Amino acid sequence: MAANQAVALPDDPAELAALSEAVIAKLATAAFTASTEGQLLETAEILERANRRFDGATSALLAEISDRSAYRKAGFLSLHAYLAGGLRLGDGEAKRRRITGAGIARLANLQGETLAPVFPATAEAVADGAIGADHVVVIDEMMRKIPSAVDPQVRAGAEARLAEVARDLTPAGVRTAGHRLLAHLDPDGALTDERDRKRLRQFGLGGQDQRLMSKVRGYLTPELRARFEVMFDSWAKPGMNNPADPASPRGAAEAADPATL
């Protein structure tokens, strides 16, 4: 079949999904040994473009599942729980898909009206197969860092610019471009206010491993950082509370005996 020959396809989404699964299953058993190097590279481009478009289709599907709370029919209380447990994606991939969908899908408001994507230029690039979910996650990350005081038109222009450069860059490259854009929009941090800090703040305490150790991740406000600095200055000075030294002074530095130190 010629590459430009039209193929009659059904309109029903479920039928299209079943058809795509059959195509992928057939492709998985295909032998590429007879293909030329040029054909191999062309096929890789086609498949990557298809995968990126699948990200867009998946986002549209998840938006409908979320709007209709269809995940409850599967016994889950939230979309995230359905993705992580029902589809067995795990928390990390479930979060990635939620972020992608929130940025490029057409969601419904409380009145049932379908809204335009939050990131319209990004959604268009995904529909073209030019960028994928990893690009969308980085664009979302950069857009969240734009101060609230920035004019909405400037913000929209920033999203369009990020989507444009994403068509030619890796996700890491988009992040670099995003940081340059942020430096241009708010070079000295003067536009960032308390609303932005509250919106961006986060603190995560990971679960304990087999050694009962836990990882910590966070993005601290100036106030919380100051509290940590006071605690570290008091309890973590050199020579204080050293578990390798039974004779090490215990407690706060202010309460330690100078003679012992």
What feature does the model see in each segment?
Residues 1-261:
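Rieske [2Fe-2S] iron-sulfur domain-containing proteins
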